[in-house]
Amino acid sequence: IGYHFARYIGQDGVKSLVTGEEYNGESVTWDDEKVKAAAESFADFAKKGYFSKNIATNKYPAGQNQEFAPGDAAIVICGSWLPNEAKDSVADDLEWGYFNYPSVPDGKDDNTANNIANQVLAINKDSKMADKAFQLIEYITTGEYDKKMTEDALCIPTDKANSDAWPTELAGVKEAFDATTTFYDWAAGVESNNDITPVLQENTQKLASGKLDAAGFIKAMKEAAGQ
């Protein structure tokens, strides 16, 4: 739902929405017309049957392993790590495809806004072996080892020298990856408020399963936010 909101109101708008604070000049509430439009379009997806009938109880990784992998679902909303996670479950001859989360009419961001590199290798500031830790990180993310990772873990290469080593399974990702103009935080910042995240998750599931309409979703979130 974070990406969906961000297409309408941008990442700063999403952060403002869930925290109730202004972000980089953006101030958005649950009464905002674009927030309502986002909720209405999400509810429309549910009404048209775009979501799994099991979505109300779908817990990771059930959707990708039990519905997408056997071919019962045509699309799964996920990241470039999916081919690696699902490689033992999908058919050997599966032809992987990919497209960015779509643009929306009159949206703040289009489909060139993406979340990239949301996992990191870090060194503790108090480490007494920081130099050696950095050498290990270099070893893992460059040269032959990096190329080996693309083969065994089906991941995007981190070393520019391996820019031609993208796995076949991720061939469809590269064009959109290279075209990225705006970089999102994880989930476009929708989890910026720990107090509201569980309620948002619960009501998003209800919205996607048709248990709430857009107005009911907005009402529930306003109550949770104290608006």
Could you tell me what each predicted segment is?
Residues Y23-I55:
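Glycine-centered hinge/linker elements that transmit conformational signals in sensory
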Residues R7-D12, K48, D126-A133, K206:
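Short helix-loop capping/hinge motifs at secondary-structure junctions, enriched
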Residues C78-P83, Q119:
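Beta->alpha turn/N-cap motifs
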Residues I1-S27, A73:
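Extracytoplasmic/periplasmic solute-binding protein
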Residues A69-C78, L94:
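Alpha-to-beta junction loops
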Residues N54-A69:
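Short helix-initiation/N-cap motifs at beta->coil->alpha
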Residues N115, E151-S163, A171-Q227:
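C-terminal capping/gating helix-and-loop segments adjacent to ligand/active sites or protein-protein/ligand interfaces
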Residues D88-A153:
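Extracytoplasmic/periplasmic substrate-recognition and gating elements
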